[in-house]
């Protein structure tokens, strides 16, 4: 088999987008729980609601936007535009503060309850943009831009970035006083700017790869194709692997979003 050697520009895009995307997800999946607890005294039920709502938003978004990207044959637009809006949505959390909400809603019975509700809503909005850009289209672009001779290396880099992102976020923000509102303004400002910046960079760094749109014209049929019993029966080993991977990831997601909160509050 002939080895296809991607360009240095491609590898740079893989590293940057994989890492920054996962940094944003670490903030959303792990630090947002700390934010809503420390700033607004959110209950365990409210934190669980936020985690569940964002998980559903991520899953549905990936299916819908992934199918739409396949239908129109474009990845770059969704990646760059999604990262831009993802960065802006991260910035918006810096505005969810008690002093701001008290000024906007002076008659509110509980400003903290308003803040908790806004965080949950904006988490779903942020997840929509992030899943559109990263989960649905960036991962599809990786498949489009690689082949069987180099896909293992590409996916290897992409797969190690969640761990790298945890180290970056922990190392970067561990020394911050997370009991201060100003700290969270800084955290959201830094990550939002970083995500927005690579959204702009993508217009120059990402090369659009040809996407076969033939067979993807029927949008909803494309969405539900993978759920058909006949398709599952024809690809039993694939779905067995997907099922095992789903169980593994569900197990991780049961505790991982609460890990930092547990460390900071219980230990």
Question: What kind of region is each of these model predictions?
Answer:
Residues 54-59, 152-177:
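Glycine-rich segments within core transmembrane alpha-helices of 12-TM secondary carriers
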Residues 1-8, 210-242:
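Juxtamembrane intracellular "pre-TM" segments in multi-pass secondary transporters
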Residues 193-212:
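C-terminal membrane-cytosol helix-exit motif in multi-pass small-molecule transporters
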Residues 123-160:
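Cytoplasmic helix-loop-helix junction between adjacent transmembrane helices
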Residues 2-57, 237-267:
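Helix-loop boundary and gating motifs at the non-cytosolic
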Residues 81-113:
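C-terminal ends and interior cores of transmembrane alpha-helices
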Residues 47-69, 88-89:
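Central cavity-lining transmembrane alpha-helices of secondary-active solute carriers
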Residues 75, 109-110, 175-193:
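A membrane-interface helix-boundary motif in multi-pass transporters
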